[in-house]
Structures are given as structure tokens and as C-alpha cells.
């Protein structure tokens, strides 16, 4: 048997977005809905009857927006022939303690949804562990072919490219599970060796510029073989960042124009001084390395004087100096304390 899995949907109001004319929805809600329905159609077209969401259907934690809840419930109703398995993610909850309330309580009355909240649940060879204050213990003590959960892993990578220290690492999972399917980190990624395979399915759309250029996807899993197939998600506006130099200027401008015609968000980044002439049509930012050595900053200077000189070098407006200085000095005090 095969199932489809996604996660980190992050339905919210997105009131600051432009309204998509065809649906009268904020742009991100429109894109999320498109991606969800494309996944539902994929299930129908490929005889898949089980659809799993690995946490974070909602975005705003203790706030439930009616427009977000309506899209969620309409989706489950539209695909009434599918069986959905849903676990809580951290954004679905009002907190992490035992008194946390889930924003997914409305799923109790949805006949084709199995909602798993609070404690772990086992179905055949699948072990579902929702986000909770005791999830780490449940995962370390559990055992199954397939683990489905929502947490950060030591070896996982954020969209920024860094890893953070977490309560779980690969050594806690090897020997207990063959395949691990996770929500929580939005960057699609996998860690695979001969003993275990771990996948962060990633968010189905690029939710903001922090997820720029990510190849978003959903996964299709064979429960008998634990084989995983990655399928690109479609139907959403992408955040595309293009780095431009004098040597690739013509090609980058062409790519930017094509992406804009397709309705995507486009940012052009200048990595060297280059005359583009497209600043009125595109978001253009400058990321040029500048030499700040030997500019009058010496070891004998006070911290305040060093910071002030640095702000001058970086051409920060003088009106902003006091604000930046306060933050920098506060940070130094905390580190030295």
C-alpha cells in the first residue's frame, strides 16, 4: 500500500498579502489551497487512498482564523474518499505543556480524518507521534518500521543553512525505525544510510523569502518496501532569487522576466557593481563584499567607538546610529556577563 505525506501547511489569514483575483483569497492562501488540491488529485489519479499531514496545518498557534479553518474543512470534504491521518505540530498548539489546546479540535467531527493529538498512536507498521511535551521520550522508547512525527533533529538543516542543537539525533533513532518522515523544518532534505532513512518532507509551497529557490515537494511512500518517491508540488507562486554579475546579466534579466510573466515573486541580487536598468520592474538588492579593513578601527578604541566607526564605514544613516549602538552594546554585555 502507498500513502502520500506532506506537512507544514501553515494556513493563516495572511491579511498583508495581495488578493488573488481568481479566488478572492490572499496570495499565500491561494497558493496553499492550490498545492493541497493538486495533492488530492494526485491521490485520486494514482489510486492512493491515504493522505498524511505531519503537523502544522495551522500557523498562528492559539489564534484560529475562520478563513483558514474553512479551507481546511472544505479540503477534507472535497476529498471524502481519502483517509487522512493528521498529527499536531507546534504551530497547531497554544503551547507545549499538558494544558496546550490544539487548533485542530474541529477535526473530531470529520469522518474521514484520524486526528492524533497529545499521545502517540500506532497503525500497522506506522508510529505517529504528535508534537507534545513528552514526544522525545515516546520516540526514544518507540519502535516501528515507519516513524511519522514533527520535531527538529540535530542533523537537520534550517533554511538559513545552519543546524541547531535539538533533543533528538540520528543515534537515538537507529535500530528503532527504518524510515522516518518528519514535519517541522521547511527545507526539503533527507539523511540516508544503510540502516535508516530520514526525510523532512518540507513545506508544500515557498511561504516567504526565507524559503526562496527551494524545490518544494510531497512524498509518496510504499509501506511494504519503505521506498520513498519525491513529487514536486505545483500551483503556487515561487520566491525566486537570482544572482547577477556583469558576465551573466543578459541571461539573468531574461530569467527574471520569464519568472515574472509566470506570476512568481522575483528578486535580483547584485553580487558586483553592475548596471541593470530594471530597478523599476524588479526588486533589486546589492550584496557586494566591501573591504572594511584598515578603515580606522583599532584595538585601542572603546567598544562604543569601534561600533560607531563601523556604522560610518557601512554608511548607516546617522539617525539610526543610536538604535544600532544600543543593540550592539546590549549584546556584548550579555555575552560577557
Residue ranges and their predicted role:
Residues 160-227:
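Conserved beta-sheet core of the metallophosphoesterase superfamily
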Residues 45, 222-337:
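Accessory, non-catalytic peripheral segments of nucleic-acid enzymes
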Residues 48, 142-144, 263:
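Short, high-confidence coil segments that cap the C-terminus of an alpha-helix
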Residues 8, 55-56, 89-90, 150, ...:
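Active-site glycine-centered loops adjacent to acidic/histidine catalytic or metal-binding residues
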Residues 1-4:
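Extreme N-terminal starter segment of soluble prokaryotic enzymes
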Residues 88-172, 201-204:
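Conserved catalytic scaffold of divalent metal-dependent phosphoesterases
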Residues 77-81, 140-141, 170-176, 193, ...:
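Short, conserved loop/helix-junction motifs that constitute active-site signature segments
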Residues 15-120, 173-177:
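Core catalytic region of metal-dependent phosphoesterases/phosphodiesterases
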Amino acid at each position: 500500500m502507498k500513502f502520500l505525506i506532506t506537512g507544514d501547511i501553515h494556513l493563516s489569514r495572511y491579511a498583508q498579502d495581495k488578493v488573488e483575483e481568481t479566488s478572492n483569497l490572499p496570495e499565500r492562501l491561494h497558493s496553499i489551497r492550490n498545492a493541497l488540491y493538486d495533492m488530492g488529485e494526485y491521490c485520486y489519479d494514482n489510486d492512493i487512498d491515504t493522505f498524511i499531514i505531519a503537523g502544522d496545518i495551522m500557523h498562528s498557534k492559539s489564534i484560529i482564523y475562520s478563513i483558514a479553518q474553512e479551507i481546511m474543512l472544505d479540503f477534507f470534504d472535497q476529498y471524502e474518499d481519502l483517509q487522512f491521518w493528521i498529527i499536531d505540530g507546534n504551530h497547531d498548539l497554544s503551547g507545549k505543556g499538558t494544558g496546550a489546546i490544539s487548533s485542530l479540535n474541529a477535526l473530531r467531527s470529520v469522518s474521514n480524518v484520524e486526528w492524533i493529538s497529545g499521545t502517540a498512536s500506532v497503525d500497522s507498521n506506522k508510529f505517529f507521534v504528535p508534537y507534545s511535551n513528552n514526544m522525545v521520550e515516546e520516540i526514544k522508547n518507540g519502535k516501528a518500521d515507519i516513524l511519522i512525527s514533527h520535531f527538529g533533529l540535530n542533523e537537520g538543516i534550517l533554511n538559513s543553512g545552519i543546524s541547531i542543537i535539538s533533543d533528538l539525533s540520528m543515534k537515538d533513532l537507529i535500530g528503532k525505525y527504518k524510515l522516518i518522515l518528519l514535519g517541522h523544518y521547511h527545507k526539503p532534505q533527507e539523511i540516508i544510510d544503510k540502516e535508516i532513512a530520514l526525510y523532512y518532507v518540507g513545506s508544500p509551497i515557498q511561504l516567504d523569502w526565507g524559503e526562496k529557490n527551494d524545490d518544494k515537494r510531497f512524498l509518496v511512500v510504499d509501506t511494504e518496501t519503505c521506498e520513498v518517491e519525491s513529487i514536486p508540488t505545483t500551483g503556487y507562486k515561487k520566491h525566486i532569487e537570482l544572482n547577477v554579475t556583469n558576465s551573466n546579466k543578459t541571461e539573468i534579466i531574461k530569467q527574471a522576466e520569464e519568472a515574472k510573466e509566470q506570476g512568481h515573486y522575483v528578486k535580483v541580487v547584485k553580487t558586483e557593481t553592475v548596471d541593470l536598468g530594471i530597478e523599476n520592474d524588479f526588486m533589486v538588492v546589492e550584496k557586494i563584499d566591501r573591504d572594511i579593513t584598515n578603515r580606522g578601527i583599532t584595538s585601542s578604541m572603546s567598544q562604543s567607538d569601534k561600533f560607531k566607526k563601523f556604522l560610518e564605514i557601512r554608511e548607516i544613516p546617522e539617525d539610526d546610529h543610536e538604535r544600532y549602538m544600543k543593540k550592539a552594546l546590549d549584546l556584548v554585555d550579555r555575552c560577557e556577563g
